[in-house]
Amino acid sequence: KQLDVPMAEVGHRYRHGKPPGLYFAGEHLTREQWAQHAGNPFPAAMKSVMPAEIAFALASKNPPLADWTQWYAAENGALDIPFAQFLAQQGLSEEAIALAYNHIPYHGRDAGDVSNLLMAFNSGFVGSQMAAGPESFAAEGGNYKITDAMAARLKGDVLLDSPVAAIEPEGKGALVTCRDGARYAADKIVSSLPLPAFRQIELGFDVPKDQAEAHAETPYQPITIAHLTTSEPFWEQDGQSPSMWSDGFSSQVIAQRYGETADEVTGLMVQARGNLALEWDELGQDAVYDRLISELGKIRPATKGKLKPRHFHSWTQEEFSGGAWAYYKAGQATRFLAAMANPVGPVHFCGEHTEYSARGVEGALASAERAALEVVPA
């Protein structure tokens, strides 16, 4: 609203239509069939909970923190354990954890690779968002309209295609050297770079040990996405939802409903996360598409001859992001966040990875406001 960018309510599009189907061990299963399936590895009281639901249901039902907003506090260090350990404490076997979380992890490569405290925060944050209501908004024409509007309001020049190579002291300020040799002096520097990109910069300032470790070791989420379009609504032929969760290579198929109405399915997003995303990256775009279309043709014969590859994107292979977002392993949440955003000389930091009260765009914006107050004279 501050930027006069028109917004559209899109939440109803995500909720529209049949819920995602479940394909497990060679079968399409309803919730009732899943609850009775011989291969269901969940405890008796959780048999009817779908694989995609159970990890989040347990995190919400049995939160480890009385106040999820304090997830990063040092006094919670004893709870800064692998999420896999928390799930085991709730009664899930290794087989159940592998199916419920490791196959499509929300954070980390698998449940052993992410802090229980980050998952507790995620559960609390998402719960607070849901409590505010079902509406969800996006900029009309794409969220890049927001950053374009922000750039248009800047008074100085925006220098594109100028990756930074080094930041070093210059008097009381800093000197920025770009890869092309161009140099720029400034009293203050604000870096919003994701840490994999920041690690590529030679920083000529002494960084405290905890902060240096946070900058060097914080991992980023592997996510790789394959977009497909279909020439016909195959789901009308087979009677299934266009979206589905599977235990195979196709993992998670999400219908995209960005037509004139939510009834129109404009495409399919197949998403790999964690270790499966890294496997996709190793195989490469063409091999992934070939295997996806082949597997979907077997799982859902109605798709045969109808699917077309459209766009493939690996966040891990992006030079200036190195992953979709920052996450924290066991032992990192209570050590890294407190030091992550401290100014280093004239260099200040913002970005989602520096924020502890929100994630996503909300976290990035909150951190940007904090950094602006740090560098603007009182």
Locate predicted features.
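Dinucleotide-binding Rossmann-like beta1-alpha1 core, especially the glycine-rich loop
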Residues: 1-52
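A short alpha-helix-loop-beta-strand transition element characteristic
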Residues: 2-19, 94-101, 235-240, 305
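Active-site/ligand-binding neighborhood in enzyme catalytic cores
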Residues: 61-163, 171-173, 192, 202, ...
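Short hydrophobic core segments
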Residues: 164, 183-196
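Conserved beta-strand-loop-beta-strand element in the redox core of flavoprotein oxidoreductases
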Residues: 168-184
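Conserved flavin/dinucleotide-binding core of flavoenzymes
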Residues: 173-175, 222, 236-378
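Flavin (primarily FAD) binding-site architecture
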Residues: 191-209
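Central beta-strand plus flanking loop segment that forms part of the substrate or channel wall
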Residues: 210-239
